[in-house]
Amino acid sequence: MLNRTVLVGRLTKDPELRSTPNGVNVGTFTLAVNRTFTNAQGEREADFINVVVFKKQAENVKNYLSKGSLAGVDGRLQTRSYDNKEGRRVFVTEVVADSVQFLEPKNNNKQNNQQHNGQTQTGNNPFDNTEEDFSDLPF
């Protein structure tokens, strides 16, 4: 049997970090993942997927990711339930991350937000404005 989930998306808000009574760090965040198709209005919809990460990786997520950061998650789907304050049973489905990959530099998130607001940024990307001729490549 196989339970594996692989996601790439952007954080909807800054990650949260808590500790269990035993001192284990637990990080949580929500990832917005675009669907591969468009709706009737021609717009792409997204799924908002809750992710849980533990120990040192939870600290790293808190320190290096923020709202809008692009991240890759490799983990497993898990369901759990609890009774809320009104005594009703609540079911939760989330991804428990085995690995979280930071897919862009930490400060790049702020640059992306500024670019989307109509401001352009000139970065130190060595691949910007390359004038290479690749026509002689065999593929």
UniProtKB/Swiss-Prot annotation:
Q: Which residues lie in Acidic residues bias regions? A: 129-139
The record's GO CC annotations read:
nucleoid
Look up keyword Transferase and say if it applies. Answer: no
Q: Which GO terms describe its molecular function?
A: single-stranded DNA binding
- Every copy of the SSB domain together lies at 1-104
**Region of interest (Disordered), residue spans:** 103-139
Compositionally biased spans, kind Low complexity: 106-125
Gene3D superfamilies under this entry? Nucleic acid-binding proteins
GO BP terms: namely: DNA replication
Q: Which SUPFAM superfamilies match?
A: Nucleic acid-binding proteins
Q: Which residues form the signal peptide?
A: none
Q: Which domain of life is it from?
A: Bacteria
Q: Does DNA-binding appear among the keywords?
A: yes
Q: Which UniProt keywords apply?
A: DNA-binding
Q: What is the protein's quaternary organization?
A: Homotetramer.
The UniProt entry, under NCBIfam families, shows:
ssb
Q: Which HAMAP family does the UniProt record give? A: SSB
Annotated protein name in UniProt = Single-stranded DNA-binding protein 2
Name the gene for this chain. ssb-p
